[in-house]
Amino acid sequence: CAGALVAEKLPHLKHVIRMGSEKSAGMHNFSAVCQLGSAAEFSQLDVIEGQLHANDPINIQFTSGTTGNPKGATLSHRNILNNAYFVGQNMHLSAADRLCIPVPLYHCFGMVMGTLCCVSHGATMVLPCEAFDPQPVLQAVQDEQCTALHGVPTMFIAELDDPNFAHYDVSSLRTGVIAGSTCPRELMKRLISDMDLAGIVTAYGQTEGGPVDTMTELDGAFEAQV
């Protein structure tokens, strides 16, 4: 029956909610789940919504601790939503895009610039692997025809230097974000020539900024990107 999931390899997974109107064995349908709430619960939701403000804290994101002990940065709804929205706008992201997100979701790169960026623009999220591995990332870009790819410089270097890189078709890529540290000039040249990422943008920021403070333009000159 719907929602009665029994997975031998994932015994602890009990519920899967699928989008769309179709029904699948072992899965809940999203529209049906939306109808499960009672009138009293919807009334309670209205009360809670009335008490919330855009500047209320939504997340305490810990910094990396490169200049001292990690600090808990308190981020607001307005902060991370605007950050994600404007990153997507700068990438010209739309519902036609498929963003590959190999960066960790517990970090502001994956959480804000990845998942929330997709949600705010209707783009598809592609999560290639549990922990970064260049081959699953390249495979996902090829199989899912990803149009965008995020990563820090060392991730992109690992992908480009993978022995099997030439066997993957990454021609669907057009944009993405490189951040976390300065992008070397030679790496930017390789991203443009070998991964078709002429539209990649460089982001600079800090956790406290949620995380992007400034970034280059999609069609900016090469010198501006590095």
Question: Residue locations for each model-derived region?
Answer:
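Short beta-strand->loop structural element characteristic of the AMP-binding/adenylate-forming
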Residues: 1, 71-74, 101, 124-131, ...
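Short, flexible, glycine-rich and Lys/Arg-enriched loop motifs at helix boundaries
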Residues: 1-12, 196, 221-226
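Conserved pre-ATP/AMP-binding loop-to-beta segment of ANL
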Residues: 9-13, 18, 24, 28-31, ...
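Gly/Ser/Thr-rich phosphate-binding loop
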Residues: 35, 123, 143-151, 160-226
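Conserved structural elements of the adenylate-forming
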Residues: 40-43, 54, 59, 73-94, ...
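Short hydrophobic/charged patches on amphipathic alpha-helices used for structural packing
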Residues: 46-49, 134-138, 157, 165
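Conserved S/T- and glycine-rich ATP-binding loop of Class I adenylate-forming
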Residues: 57, 63-66, 99, 105, ...
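Conserved AMP-binding/adenylation subdomain of ANL enzymes
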Residues: 81-98, 108-148, 162
